Amino acid sequence: MSATDLVSELGARFGDAVLGEQTTRERFPTVWIRPEASAAVHRYLKHEVERPFRMLVDLWAIDETARKHREGQPPSGITIASHLMSHERNADIRLKVGLDAEYPSAKSIAGVYPNAAWYEREAYDMFGVEFEAQPHSLRILLPPGWEGHPMRKTQPGRATERPLFNMTAALFDAKEHALAADPEKFGLPTHRDGVELMILNYGPHSMATHGVFRIVLALDGEEIVAARPDIGFHHRGAEKMAERQTWHNFLPYTDRVDYLGGVMGEMPYLQAVEKACGITVPDRALTVRVMLSEMFRIMNHLLFYGTMAQDTGAMSPVFYMFVDRERGYRVIEAITGARMHPGYFRIGGLSMDLPQGWDRLVREFLDWMPARLADYEGMVLRNEIFQARTKGVAAYDTAMALDWGVTGPGLRATGSAWDVRKARPYSGFENFEFEIPVGHNGDCYDRTVVRVEEIRQSLKIIRQCVDNMPSGPIKADHPLTTPPPRERMLHDIETMIHHFVGASWGPVLPPGETTGQVETVRGLTQFALISDGEPSSYRTRIRTPSFPHLQMISAVAPGMMVADLVAYLGSIDYVMSDVDR
């Protein structure tokens, strides 16, 4: 069934509740539906349609009140967009619902897609959208006492535009009291079988939480009866920043959404921007992008490997693996000029070409790693204590993973070989030979094994990049390539003007909506961009994998011991900047 057939099927099934299809540059349909039909349409697409859309990838809000280019779209003050995926079809569909701008209200779809709950809370937090039947209508990224909804167009985008903030002693006490672990507020039980449960704050300063993040637990002894993750302590307003930076100037921020992913965070953003511009990136630049992305995958997975061993009682491996990471970062630094956040990619290509001798450095790293990985297998994967702490712990199957929006190694550990690099190749990944490691049990052990095997596959991909690096330009010959090639600046007045405008004002993208999807170190990262014909984004939506992965804790943790929760958190491999943005 084609995308057109699917839209026709929805129209036949729901009649005038389907308002029509929006014209976009996407490879998937975007369909507007009436608010009252939202739950029914989502339920149909998940449970009734042939080869159903089992995963809610993302749900977000758009403030349409200042938008100038909305041709062909129904009236809407606040729009709710939901992005669904069918792995069986290898296809997506986006649904949109138009709401009133002053008092936006919509029906919750958390009863259809469980992972919608946090996305709906975020839409309330940032835009003020009330969702009927939402089980926890709480703020999620902002503190409980926050006033207003900062992603609305009427809200300021800079601290200097807000009143002076003064943290008085009374205000500090009030904010501290608001963060108390109130079981009623978090929807936690206080008794089981007539026995009072202990309410425990797990974090936000525990080393086991891997960042500023807490879980409020209801415990019967050491057994977890219920768990409620509490996030937002690391929120920095990345999506709001995108609205006041030019398309070019926002690039360094993408490195810091997942601060361990490096250049990989730049890829989905640039995909969407380059699609909007109609830019074809040269082969050399595409191959360099692949090579550096896989280098950062290895850097991340080595950190995961070492800290996972440390979380389960092995102290030595993490020190050995930091030696390997230092070698890798020296290669990255030699090529890009920086280590963790290079900002190396550009709209249309790269910031600069590969330096002389780059291939020798990369080959030395490739030759170094295999023996090290073999040593670590004995230290960690074949270690009886590690196996006892991880096998059968925090296990879930593919169906549950899809219900909660799990992607990346967490999904592949259940036996699903879904990987964007294979299913929807980008940046030339279709030209590389590599396997997709999968597990079978979906437990902590399999999630570790999958990431270790991914290191080996990344080494294989990088070696192919070195052996087959194309020659040619590193930037596209396109007027919106930013910044334009400097060597052409003084040829004539036209090229000089293009360079001046590109370097100072930045490119102006045509109005429209585009999406970029990449298999980052933690799973599917998606940037959904709206251009209104300005030098800056009208709306930048950043879908990160860590956000739904933490939401799933409330479904997986009950029944396990507190010590098992440590192993489970380590096996998720989340980064709080990736969660809170």
Curated annotation (Swiss-Prot):
Q: Does the keyword Transport apply?
A: yes
Keyword Translocase listed: yes
In residue numbers, the region (NADH dehydrogenase I subunit D) covers: 196-581
Gene3D superfamilies per the record?
A: Cytochrome-c3 Hydrogenase, chain B (1.10.645.10), NADH:ubiquinone oxidoreductase, 30kDa subunit (3.30.460.80)
User: What domain of life does the native source organism fall in?
Assistant: Bacteria
Task: Provide the catalytic activity annotation.
Answer: a quinone + NADH + 5 H(+)(in) = a quinol + NAD(+) + 4 H(+)(out)
Query: Where in the cell does this protein reside?
Result: Cell inner membrane
**Which terms in the Gene Ontology molecular function aspect does this entry carry?**
NAD binding; NADH dehydrogenase (ubiquinone) activity; NADH:ubiquinone reductase (non-electrogenic) activity; quinone binding
Q: InterPro entries from the entry?
A: NADH_DH_suCD, NADH_Q_OxRdtase_suD, NADH_quin_OxRdtase_su_C/D-like, NADH_UbQ_OxRdtase_30kDa_su, NADH_UbQ_OxRdtase_49kDa_CS, NDH1_su_D/H, NiFe-Hase_large
Q: Which Pfam families match?
A: Complex1_30kDa (PF00329), Complex1_49kDa (PF00346)
Write out the ranges of the annotated region (NADH dehydrogenase I subunit C): 1-172
Key words, A-Z: Cell inner membrane, Cell membrane, Membrane, Multifunctional enzyme, NAD, Quinone, Translocase, Transport, Ubiquinone
Topology of the protein relative to the lipid bilayer: Peripheral membrane protein
Its EC number is 7.1.1.-
Q: Name one GO cellular component term.
A: NADH dehydrogenase complex
State what this protein does.
NDH-1 shuttles electrons from NADH, via FMN and iron-sulfur (Fe-S) centers, to quinones in the respiratory chain. The immediate electron acceptor for the enzyme in this species is believed to be ubiquinone. Couples the redox reaction to proton translocation (for every two electrons transferred, four hydrogen ions are translocated across the cytoplasmic membrane), and thus conserves the redox energy in a proton gradient.
Task: Enumerate the PANTHER family for this protein.
Answer: NADH-QUINONE OXIDOREDUCTASE SUBUNIT C_D (PTHR11993:SF45), NADH-UBIQUINONE OXIDOREDUCTASE 49 KDA SUBUNIT (PTHR11993)
The entry sums up its family as follows: In the N-terminal section; belongs to the complex I 30 kDa subunit family. In the C-terminal section; belongs to the complex I 49 kDa subunit family.
Mind telling me which HAMAP family this protein's record contains?
A: NDH1_NuoCD_1 (MF_01359), NDH1_NuoD (MF_01358)
**Subunit annotation:** NDH-1 is composed of 13 different subunits. Subunits NuoB, CD, E, F, and G constitute the peripheral sector of the complex.
Protein name listed in UniProt: NADH-quinone oxidoreductase subunit C/D
Q: Which organism is it from?
A: Rhodopseudomonas palustris (strain HaA2)
Q: Which gene encodes it?
A: nuoC
